[in-house]
Amino acid sequence: MVDLESEVPPLPPRYRFRDLLLGDQGWQNDDRVQVEFYMNENTFKERLKLFFIKNQRSSLRIRLFNFSLKLLSCLLYIIRVLLEKPSQGNDWSHIFWVNRSLPLWGLQVSVALISLFETILLGYLSYKGNIWEQILRVPFILEIINAVPFIISIFWPTLRNLFVPVFLNCWLAKHALENMINDLHRAIQRTQSAMFNQVLILISTLLCLIFTCICGIQHLERIGKKLNLFDSLYFCIVTFSTVGFGDVTPETWSSKLFVVAMICVALVVLPIQFEQLAYLWMERQKSGGNYSRHRAQTEKHVVLCVSSLKIDLLMDFLNEFYAHPRLQDYYVVILCPTEMDVQVRRVLQIPMWSQRVIYLQGSALKDQDLLRAKMDNAEACFILSSRCEVDRTSSDHQTILRAWAVKDFAPNCPLYVQILKPENKFHIKFADHVVCEEEFKYAMLALNCICPATSTLITLLVHTSRGQCVCLCCREGQQSPEQWQKTYGRCSGNEVYHIVLEESTFFAEYEGKSFTYASFHAHKKFGVCLVGVRREDNKNILLNPGPRYIMNASDICFYINITKEENSAFKNQDQQRKSNVSRSFYHGPSRLPVHSIIASMGTVAIDLQDTSCRAASGPTLALPSEGGKELRRPSIAPVLEVADTSSIQTCDLLSDQSEDETTPDEETSSNLEYAKGYPPYSPYIGSSPTFCHLLQEKVPFCCLRLDKSCQHNYYEDAKAYGFKNKLIIVAAETAGNGLYNFIVPLRAYYRPKKELNPIVLLLDNPPDMHFLDAICWFPMVYYMVGSIDNLDDLLRCGVTFAANMVVVDKESTMSAEEDYMADAKTIVNVQTLFRLFSSLSIITELTHPANMRFMQFRAKDCYSLALSKLEKKERERGSNLAFMFRLPFAAGRVFSISMLDTLLYQSFVKDYMISITRLLLGLDTIPGSGFLCSMKITEDDLWIRTYARLYQKLCSSTGDVPIGIYRTESQKLTTSESQISISVEEWEDTKDVKDPGHHRSIHRNSTSSDQSDHPLLRRKSMQWARRLSRKGPKHSGKTAEKITQQRLNLYRRSERQELAELVKNRMKHLGLSTVGYDEMNDHQSTLSYILINPSPDTRLELNDVVYLIRPDPLSYLPNSEPSRKNSICNAAVQDSREETQL
């Protein structure tokens, strides 16, 4: 490089001085060469080609001019025929010579000259080296036939009356029309419609055939009948319609031959055109055609993008979307890359859906298909992932690309996206609303373990039910004879609504008052449950911000009610008093119907005597002293307008008192073990930070393995750890990132440390290191590699003393060849667990909600059969929640993530639903926002009596807001139902039993909800006993008595005892203690259900679990020293405040 630089000589001084004055322009201009590009387009031929062919607009004008010219020539031919006088005689000269006036001849010559010149010019411009290709084209030959004779007649005047078949120009006009339509579509930038073109070609072909036949017959009959144009038209229409009256017929052989030729041409050309049209029509039916621009601009529509459309997904979307009155005029455009299956096609042919649903086959990644769906004019776009795929990550990737494509094509279109894996969520943060399936699923299953039936509670809240229907017969469960089904169905109609406080009749009077005061009095007066609020200048929703929050006029209130306030009617005070008097004669558990409370503005008749003049009786719900009890009912402190937080407790009123009795040594050890803070490691990007109970130091990975000893501990089974609380076992296929959201809600900072349950992850596959890094900071979290198929694995992980077992649906089994068979393995495994461990609370996730009828299946249980019939009736009535009366769902024992699809659909109308659901599930934590928890009603709490008094007690003491009740009752069957449960064959088997008491016991046990509860034989034993009973008449009396005795001995050995013995033997074989196995404890003869926002006078019952939204403990600090328990809670809150720096 140095040598090259040394070879360059220095510039002379004069050049240096010139460069200083003029810059570098002087010598650069000397060497610069101007280059012109695209010189090939500057030739005369290329300029003509650009004007006549390439340029869209000029080419369209040329095509239009050519089309008009051909129509003009046909019009001149008709004028010539009409002006011509009929010739005399039948000489053949009339075929070759016609009478043509001079002006008409001049016009036809001019048209011929222009047409021929244009044809030759276009042929020259499109010439590509083969001259015969241009000459032998049919349009060029027709042009020569129709134009050259007129040009020759200019120089040879005797040929001016020569007949020229100018009517053949109609075919040239047809050809020009096709080219013009193509150029028109290019000019207006519109996607060409093959169906439109084909229909146009068919119509123009038919018209050309008829016009050619009319003119040809009329001319050939000049030597015959002398037909005019109208007679020729009549003859052609009659002939082509196959009617053939015969009143007008051709006479000459030439005209007859021409008619035969035209019929042959029609029989060849028209079927081809119809076949192509039919093919395109079928393809159009498959692809769905287009959604017109005019409709998109004048009507409202949303687009649903899916990779494959199943009938269940379609009906869930349509039922939920059109459940809102203001969406009745919307259209749904479905954009799916696959062909419509038979079931979907059948549904979309129903008039109710065919008028509002349009199916387009196409891909969201193609702008052409997005244009067909008019995505840029859509009100919203719903993009759903296909969960029934083996590779769910690949399904998410497709969803991400669809979302990007829609955002690129229509940036102003609101996006509602469903994603499966939480690690993929950050790719679509730009979407307006996102629902991550695994996040919601695991958080909901986790809360099910500490707040029973949370999954059912959330599912009912996000579904649009018919509980608010005016017609009683249309409401869920109102036709059932069971009272619990009526109450449960009516309360299921409660949903979350919003309204501005100053515009509300419910809440306007509470401006300037505390949130808890407004919540209690709104429920007392109107029966609505105020659960959250949002400032006008803030996007964050606060669930139960507590008694320190003062309501403003501009606040947006979120409340639970049967219907929104705008659809409610209010009675005056006199009407309410009359209704209260008439209603006071009934003293049932639910005295006032919900709808009557909603429609009233008066105060509900709640017995709160002496509550306005008495102070709080104590910090808990405990019953006051006996002396006070003898004089009057226990009093409840009133809810203050502006709360005095010195009397507000931040701890659970009904929490375990053992936490108060903790010794100083236990407190010291507890403080050393646990800390409060944010998890230092998150397994995926985009997880919401949650304040949790954490360990001071992370646990070594070897200590996370439950069934393997290491150098730090020597425990090899759950029993050896000596946990004080019962286990929560999660059976999953893999330790995905979503499983992290199962642990976080159970280790949230507001959960008491004494109530933390150990978590055991029973995994089919070993977890990876990233997942272990995330969970090693949480206390009492372990994993074990095993399967629920293996009894030994279940026993090692501590299933015998577990509080809950969560069975997560496996990804590898989510897809099956036959619909609804994806849950087969899960259902059978859970049924085995149900048989082996009847006292275990099992929470199962299924792929298809329809399969929940197989959970805890009892084929001969008449109560389950009655519920099956009720479900069918509700489905026939059009209910969106036909499965809600199934006992496993009502009790919160089964859940399907597809039930939460409606959460995304509801967000189109209620854009706050996703945020509220995430706050309830603990997926998001906002400072000042409360959390979902529960409390159990014990015998000491029954003095409160009603739900309204409980509402007041909670609001006045702790600031908690109750939102519902989880109630458990024993199953009671009527005599008729009991009789149904015994089949004829069983009755024949038991009719020989002489002991009436034993017969009654068998009869009573047969009505139980669990067929395995009473002493029945296994299947083979029953078959053997029946065979003996059928052979009975063949034996003597002594033999019959012997057979009867053998059958009684078999009955005494129950299936439950055999299973219990099997489990105990396996436990002994594994070296496990059998003390924790309670083989006879059974809670399966009960039914549980949820009452969302029950009426204020609903009676509390023993073992009711009340759902609470508790204020954030970190939002305030009490100023006084109430009780010892309260001070402990305040200290915990103070520690939390110091750690979080909030």
From Swiss-Prot:
Primary residence: membrane
Composition bias, Basic residues: 1017-1037
Topological region Cytoplasmic: 1-63, 123-137, 174-198, 278-1142
Chain intervals for the UniProt region annotation (Disordered): 989-1044, 1118-1142
Gene Ontology terms describing biological process: potassium ion export across plasma membrane; potassium ion transmembrane transport; potassium ion transport
Oligomeric form and interacting partners: Homotetramer. Forms heteromer with KCNT1; heteromeric channels differ from those of homomeric channels in their unitary conductance, kinetic behavior, subcellular localization, and response to activation of protein kinase C.
Protein name: Potassium channel subfamily T member 2
Species in which this protein is naturally found: Rattus norvegicus (Rat)
